[in-house]
Amino acid sequence: MLPLVWAGGTVTVAQAAGATLGEPRDVAFTATIDGTQQRYVEMLPDGFDPGREHDVLIVLHGHGSDRWQYVRDRRAECMVPRAVAAQHGMIYVSPDYRGPTSWMGPKAEADLVQIIATLRREYRVDRVVLAGASMGGTAALTFAALHPNMVAGVVSQNGTANLVEFDKFQDAITASFGGTKQMVPQQYMQRSAEFHADALKMPIAITAGGKDTVVPPQSVLRLARVLEQQHRPVRLIFREAGGHDTNEADTVAAFDFVIEAVAQAPRKQPAAVR
């Protein structure tokens, strides 16, 4: 079993409850969109029972990382979701989603749709929760806006909700989206969650820092404000002095909010997946 350890401590909430995740399984698959081999890591909860329904936690890595970030990294943003999945008996999935410079372009989106379809074929999957930080936090919001009926909840940490105004990592985003903002403006609009707030009816937790210069927080602050005005289940954790990271306590609070809200939400039929 993979140990789950909080930063600054030797005993975790998950360990105290006797919860663990199984060994990571590195899964290769052929992407239907282009025939290339892609990968994701899957970890089943301790005592996994294939005969009953399980929720899924899909975690999306940051820029420059890969599918192993949320499996091996000892930062709070990565350790907390592992513990959450173990504690709640969730299937834990960490995809490459087109590698270190994804930004949830069309191929990454198609891969994630395919992964969710595969999980639903292989297991009795109930609800799917997305989480990520930085590029992963952006990607989680983007995918939820594009496929709201496939996502039951979102934890977005230090991401952006507006890829039209975002001016960092433009070479990577251009390659992922198939062109610049001037060449394919519809891709940047379509993948900016701020422009699709009406689709975001699921529980969402957003963390952001006022001094984050890597992924400035203004767009997620605006998105959270709109969601609050629409009486959506949203929790914003904003630290004026915070930078491009989220501490352990705020990460725990964000996941607690979403997991609890998802558990209380009425069931809905899963979307058909292609």
Which residue stretches match the model-derived regions?
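A domain-start/cap signature at the N-terminus of enzymes
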Residues: 8-54, 186, 234, 255, ...
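Short substrate-entry loop that stabilizes the transition state in hydrolases
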Residues: 49-54, 60-104, 164
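Mobile cap/lid helix-loop segments that gate and shape the active-site cleft of serine hydrolases
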Residues: 69-76, 159-196, 202
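Alpha/beta-hydrolase active-site loop
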Residues: 103-122
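C-terminal catalytic histidine-bearing segment of alpha/beta-hydrolase fold enzymes
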Residues: 104, 214, 218-274
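Primarily recognizes the serine-hydrolase "nucleophile elbow" in alpha/beta-hydrolase
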Residues: 118-121, 126-172
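Short beta-strand/loop motif that positions the catalytic acidic residue
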Residues: 200, 206-208, 212
